[in-house]
Amino acid sequence: MKFVIIQCVKAYHHELEQIFKSIRINAYSEMDVEGFMEQADGNTDFSNWFGSRKNPYNYMVSFSFLAEDKANELLERVDEFNKSIESMSPMKAYIVGVEKFV
């Protein structure tokens, strides 16, 4: 079992929902997030995800527990989507292994 986390700007939320639907991910959770960076100067790898204290960056985080093959398929679809757009804020997706659960 894998824990998949996806960061998505709200402008691409509909596209993310379509990706979930296309590969039959029927159970996932989402939350709105405000990102902050102490010195948002535009020179770091993550500067497009975090705003300054005065202007936080608003995005969504979606997450789901998936079988490994489904998690890999989801990341492949996110990668395909990112390659199809010209944006400073592509979706970010992470797979985290689940060691134990009860």
Indicate where each model-derived feature is located.
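Positively charged, small/polar-rich N-terminal and surface patches that mediate targeting and assembly
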Residues: 1-102
